[in-house]
């Protein structure tokens, strides 16, 4: 059997977050509605990017954030995600590998630039987001490296991969390889709208044993089981046969299996700045804990510690090593 070399392989949309401070007039000139979030096409994405002036670039994407979190804990993550052979693709590659993530997905050589979320910040702090998916939607089964999947304790994938047909095929191919090598497969539901699009297919992944572990928040799990009652959704998750890691914001987290339910409290945070990466970093802590044979309680506690750290600042990546924070809270990392 292949030796486990990675705590987790994270697979998802490789998106570069590009931040720029702009004046109100800039939004007016570009016909943008302040505070809005929208998807844009290639020509507009390139034109807007070229007008942004001085920018700060941070590699993003949900699964990428989780991989970076595992690395920050001192773990060994790998990542699959598609970028182009362009300036932002260079930044993404450098950034991911620089944080300690093994990342070597072949780059797209033609026609679609690297995905980017261009975030324009006006003097009042309001964010106007313009997202171009570009190259990340071209992830396909040919990008799934069997040796890496076989060497990962768990393969963790975004629900967003279900949108492009080739990415869906890649998801299923990676899951099949993982199980062939007696590894685990996890999905994060991504958002409630994604759940609404693919509800039957996602529940099928659970009931058919394609997915062993599901990550969801309260909105997503209610959407999955079409109920407004959390306890009803929890009961349905318990009957799915898979493990569910459920984040509940200020109420902490719950781990649900057919045999047991574990509840852990959230860490106290007095000044919440940005909730963007909370779920991604919870997953990082939990997956890290599972790879090191922590109890479900301890793995969930570490997940909550990681989530509490990232919501204290802007952005979805750790600002300080999570390894130190975990050690301060009594974890051996």
Spans of features found by a protein language model:
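Glycine-rich phosphate/adenosyl-contacting loop at the front of the ribokinase-like
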Residues: 1-80, 87-91
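Conserved phosphate-binding/catalytic region of the ribokinase-like
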Residues: 1-9, 14, 28-34, 177-180, ...
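A short, aliphatic-rich alpha-helical micro-motif
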Residues: 3, 148-151, 206-208, 238
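Alpha-helix C-terminal capping segments
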Residues: 67-76, 120-122, 289-292
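Hydrophobic beta-strand scaffold residues
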Residues: 77, 103, 185-186, 244
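A glycine-rich helix N-cap at a beta->alpha junction
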Residues: 95-112
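Conserved phosphate-binding/catalytic loop of the ribokinase/pfkB sugar-kinase fold
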Residues: 104-108, 119-165
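Conserved beta-alpha-beta core of the PfkB/ribokinase-like small-molecule kinase fold
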Residues: 154-235, 242, 251-253
């Amino acid at each position: 059997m292949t030796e486990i070399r990675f705590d987790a392989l994270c697979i998802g949309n490789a998106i570069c977050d590009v931040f720029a401070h702009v004046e109100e007039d800039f939004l007016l000139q570009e016909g943008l509605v302040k505070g809005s979030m929208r998807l844009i096409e290639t020509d507009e994405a390139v034109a807007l990017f070229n007008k942004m002036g001085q920018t700060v670039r941070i590699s993003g994407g949900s699964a990428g954030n989780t991989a970076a979190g595992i690395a920050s804990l001192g773990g060994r993550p790998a990542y699959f995600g598609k970028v182009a052979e362009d300036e932002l693709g260079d930044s993404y590659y450098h950034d991911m590998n620089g944080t300690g993530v093994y990342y070597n997905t072949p780059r797209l050589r033609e026609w679609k630039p690297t995905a980017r979320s261009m975030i324009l910040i006006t003097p009042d702090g309001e964010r106007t987001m313009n997202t171009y998916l570009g190259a990340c939607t071209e992830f396909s089964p040919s990008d799934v490296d069997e040796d890496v999947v076989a060497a990962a304790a768990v393969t963790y994938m975004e629900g967003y991969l279900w949108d492009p047909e080739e990415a869906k095929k890649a998801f299923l191919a990676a899951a099949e390889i993982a199980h062939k090598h007696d590894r685990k497969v996890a999905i994060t539901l991504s958002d409630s709208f994604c759940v609404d699009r693919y509800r039957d297919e996602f529940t099928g992944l659970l009931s058919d044993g394609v997915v062993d572990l599901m990550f969801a928040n309260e909105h997503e799990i209610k959407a999955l089981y079409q109920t407004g009652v959390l306890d009803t959704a929890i009961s349905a998750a318990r009957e799915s046969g898979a493990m569910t890691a459920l984040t509940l914001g200020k109420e902490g987290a719950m781990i649900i299996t057919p045999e047991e339910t574990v509840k852990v409290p959230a860490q106290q945070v007095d000044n919440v700045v940005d909730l963007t990466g909370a779920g991604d970093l919870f997953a990082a802590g939990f997956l890290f804990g599972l790879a090191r044979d922590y109890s479900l309680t301890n793995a969930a506690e570490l997940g909550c510690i990681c989530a509490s750290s990232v919501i204290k600042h802007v952005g979805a990546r750790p600002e300080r090593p999570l390894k130190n924070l975990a050690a301060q809270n009594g974890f051996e990392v």
